[in-house]
Amino acid sequence: MKNIFTIDTEDWYHANFEDGLFTNDSNVISTVEKNIDRYLELFSENDVKATFFVLGFVVEQHPQMIKKIAAEGHEIASHGYGHQLVYKQTKKEFREDVYKSKGLIEDLIGCEVLGYRAPSWSIIEESLWALDILEELGFKYNSAIFPTKNFLYGIPYAPRSAHNATV
């Protein structure tokens, strides 16, 4: 499957600004379903398929939405469990976060999860160790490094095209 559209499937409160607004409080008003429905309608009207990088937290809160995305032929990939920045996690925390997310998705949709995107593209030079963990967990590709540098993420010298792409 070759998709040119990707959607980070998270809610408004998962944004990362310095310490962020992040919360895993299920009592916060969610807008993710309404927004994803808009994308699905647009993609359907234009016969487009996309990759949806979904948080494990969103899988738990909106399982029917995730099933609908998959049923419409879109790829479901991991965005981690709780939208924690990779470079703020230990190796152990990162492994547990991604393992949990991958398992939740695979159990729900019955398909192997091949891809991963770090929250806020937070694999930076200091957290390249995460790539080894992703490989150990069976991921075939990642979309987790942004080839520029800003206040939150990026590796300016990173390749701007697929590197050793096999999927």
Protein language model features and the residues they cover:
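Alpha-helical scaffold elements lining the catalytic groove of polysaccharide deacetylases
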Residues: 33, 85-107, 166
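Hydrophobic residues in well-ordered beta-strands that form the structural core
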Residues: 52, 78, 141-143
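Short catalytic/ligand-binding loop motif for oxyanion handling, primarily in non-cytosolic enzymes
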Residues: 13-15, 60-62, 84-87, 123-127, ...
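Phosphate/nucleotide-binding catalytic core
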Residues: 55, 101, 105, 117-119
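Active-site-adjacent pocket scaffolds in enzyme catalytic domains
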Residues: 107, 111-112, 118-167
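Active-site beta->alpha N-cap acidic-glycine motif
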Residues: 1-72, 117
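Histidine-centered catalytic micro-motifs
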Residues: 76-83
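Short, electropositive alpha-helical surface patch
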Residues: 59-76, 128-140
